[in-house]
């Protein structure tokens, strides 16, 4: 009980320090995460070792870059939770077979099945929330990432592909240079406006 209270205090402190607004995180989702953390316990020293799974500085940049990165984060969470679900036992053992396996300390095999089912349902709930957010708020990023992944599928050994790619290069090189130049100009104008505001 004391450990649960301590975990809640630490989570609140972490949300405050990192500047995360919990207004988008439904209360039920927050509660579900807290319950899952009881199942996936690690020492506090490991949780706060200074090496987050998703480094904070990766979220720097303009809005478009942040959106693309956050799409990748949501996709990674989808994969991670899918992996966590696969690690859970799929079905309880047939009757009579629990005599063969020793119960874990403090629980019987009969007690473990509902706990695993509860963990599974909670993980499924979190997965659905992530998938909903990704599907409804990150569609453009999804399309862009699929287009980027398709670039990796280009047949490098194909002579036709090589020739066509060379033919298309001047036009694409022009677009890439112009895009980078326009972005740099916009950044300089923004910096100049900010300097003017500071002087005023």
Swiss-Prot record:
Residues 95-110 have a biased composition (Polar residues). GO terms for biological process: immune response. It is found in: Secreted. Keywords: Cytokine, Glycoprotein, Secreted, Signal. Residues 1-22 form the signal peptide. Residues 91-114 are annotated as: Disordered. The keyword Signal applies. Gene3D superfamilies: 1.20.1250.10. Its main location: secreted. GO terms for molecular function: cytokine activity; type II interferon receptor binding. InterPro entries: 4_helix_cytokine-like_core, Interferon_gamma. Probable cytokine. This is Interferon gamma 1. It comes from Oryzias latipes (Japanese rice fish).
